[in-house]
């Protein structure tokens, strides 16, 4: 197809204006996790491992619900582009019902995490810390998801700056709170890894109150009328539409995260050094992943608005410009990892064995930067088109059909080669992400071949 390079600067500018605040917001959120790992590492590798194993349970479930709620963003963006802002408040109110529907079972899981930890043969030396950490995180998940719902509205309105400011403030608060609760300052008992959970719960509640205050007082959003009603009965029709779009996103997010998170659980019997080095490489890769992830979210917002304006050909051009820009970011990230793979682990641990393992794993992380960037931007494009079911099918096949079983085989068994430990999972990460990126781009090409009138009619039915 004609990529219309003369439009690239204009389209890149649209995307960058949204990407920068989204990136800062994502980076701040990821920075909280990084601060937890780094500060817990000053206590012991056992505390780092406790957080790593806890996060392998917490984040897949949290991100599943986040994925479902993310269906609200392209819907709001589409309604905003179609000049139907009066329909937006209803979507957000129904989003609150979804939050409560999911949050109660999540709390039950977190309060009974010992069943999962026992099943995975997690070493007793940090299993109890993981249980206590998750019990505290159960307190903070309610405000975290309520904040996501309000953030999705602002993102859909192409207004990501409030979330950027609030999340950055959350990061600034998280670090001193970690210091107080991890090391036991100002009369607070020393909690180690569990202190990270206490700090995170406090920060989550604070961020929700700030986001609520912004949405309540922001004059440009008054016409939406979100707070004209303080209570609205659940609408089966609207909730079904959100779930039809959001559940595939949620399950796709869950399957991808599980590819990474279950690796920590399967590696935990190999000891603290292996888990800590694996977590070091994973945390570094996750920080760099924030750029294409933010770009993918920005692409969803722009495409939703453009499709709401019925500009189907313009949406095609923006899609491919976004993919190309994602590759550029990935190449830069890969080069940085290769150049500094021996230095990066020093920020996480002082153990020489953990440093050596992490340095090796980071080279695998460099390899998969391009396919990982392509798949996340492609995900954003398909969400903008509200074409989410194929994303689920691709991710389940690539990450659960290939990634998890073959990662386990390479890491823990001698069925194919001698056990590769963490490197076995990282090799499969590269394979799974490469396959997923190719299949998702194929899905983009497929939906863009649909006649414009047919595509718009489909989008109107599910708005």
Swiss-Prot record:
> Which chain regions cross the lipid bilayer?
20-42, 57-79, 96-118, 133-150, 162-184, 194-216, 245-267, 287-306, 318-340, 355-377, 390-412, 422-444
Q: Which domain of life is it from?
A: Bacteria
Give the Pfam families listed for this entry: MatE
Q: Name one GO biological process term.
A: monoatomic ion transport
Example GO molecular function: xenobiotic transmembrane transporter activity
Q: Which UniProt keywords apply?
A: Antiport, Cell inner membrane, Cell membrane, Ion transport, Membrane, Transmembrane, Transmembrane helix, Transport
Q: Could you confirm whether the keyword Hydrolase appears in this record? A: no
Cellular component terms per the entry's GO annotation: plasma membrane
The record's listing under CDD domains reads: MATE_NorM_like
| Subcellular location, record wording | Cell inner membrane
In the bilayer, the protein is annotated as: Multi-pass membrane protein
User: What family does the Swiss-Prot or TrEMBL record give for this protein?
Assistant: Belongs to the multi antimicrobial extrusion (MATE) (TC 2.A.66.1) family.
Please give the function described in this protein's UniProt entry.
Multidrug efflux pump.
Give the protein name, as stated in the record: Probable multidrug resistance protein NorM
Q: What species was this sequence derived from?
A: Haemophilus ducreyi (strain 35000HP / ATCC 700724)
């Amino acid at each position: 197809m004609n990529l219309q390079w003369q439009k690239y600067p204009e389209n890149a500018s649209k995307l960058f204006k949204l990407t920068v605040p989204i990136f800062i917001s994502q980076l701040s959120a990821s920075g909280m996790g990084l601060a937890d790992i780094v500060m817990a590492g000053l206590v012991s590798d056992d505390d780092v491992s406790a957080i790593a194993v806890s996060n392998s349970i917490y984040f897949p479930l949290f991100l599943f619900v986040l994925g479902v709620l993310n269906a609200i963003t392209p819907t709001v963006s589409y309604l905003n582009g179609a000049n139907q802002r009066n329909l937006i408040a209803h979507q957000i109110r129904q989003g609150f019902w979804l939050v409560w529907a999911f949050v109660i079972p999540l709390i039950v899981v977190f309060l009974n995490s010992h069943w999962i930890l026992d099943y995975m043969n997690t070493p007793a030396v940090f299993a109890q810390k993981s249980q206590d950490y998750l019990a505290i995180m159960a307190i903070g998940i309610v405000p975290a998801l309520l904040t996501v719902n309000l953030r999705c509205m602002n993102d859909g309105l192409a207004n990501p700056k409030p979330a950027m400011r609030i999340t950055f403030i959350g990061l600034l608060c998280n670090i001193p709170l970690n210091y107080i609760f991890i090391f036991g300052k100002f009369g607070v008992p020393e909690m180690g890894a569990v202190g990270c959970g206490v700090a995170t719960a406090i920060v989550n509640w604070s961020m929700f109150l700030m986001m609520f205050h912004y949405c309540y007082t922001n004059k440009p959003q008054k016409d939406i009328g979100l707070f004209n009603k303080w209570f609205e009965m659940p609408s089966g029709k609207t909730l079904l539409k959100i779930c039809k779009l959001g559940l595939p996103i949620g399950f796709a997010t869950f399957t991808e995260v599980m590819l990474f998170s279950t690796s920590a659980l399967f590696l935990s019997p190999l000891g603290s050094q292996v888990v800590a080095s694996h977590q070091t490489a994973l945390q570094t890769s996750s920080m760099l992943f924030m750029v294409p992830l933010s770009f993918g979210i920005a692409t969803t917002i722009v495409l939703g608005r453009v499709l709401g304006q019925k500009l189907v050909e313009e949406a095609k051009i923006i899609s491919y410009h976004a993919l190309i820009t994602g590759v550029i970011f990935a190449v830069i990230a890969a080069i940085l990892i290769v150049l500094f793979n021996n230095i990066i682990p020093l920020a996480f641990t002082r153990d020489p064995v953990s440093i050596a393992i992490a340095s090796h794993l980071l080279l695998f992380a460099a390899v998969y930067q391009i396919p990982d960037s392509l798949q996340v931007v492609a995900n954003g494009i398909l969400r903008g088109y509200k074409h989410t079911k194929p994303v689920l099918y691709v991710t389940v096949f690539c990450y659960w059909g290939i990634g998890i079983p073959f990662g386990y085989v390479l890491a823990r068994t001698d069925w194919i080669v001698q056990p590769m430990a963490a490197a076995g999972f990282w090799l499969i990460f590269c394979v799974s992400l490469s396959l997923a990126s190719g299949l998702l781009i194929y899905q983009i090409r497929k939906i863009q071949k649909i006649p414009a009138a047919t595509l718009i009619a489909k989008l109107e039915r599910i708005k």
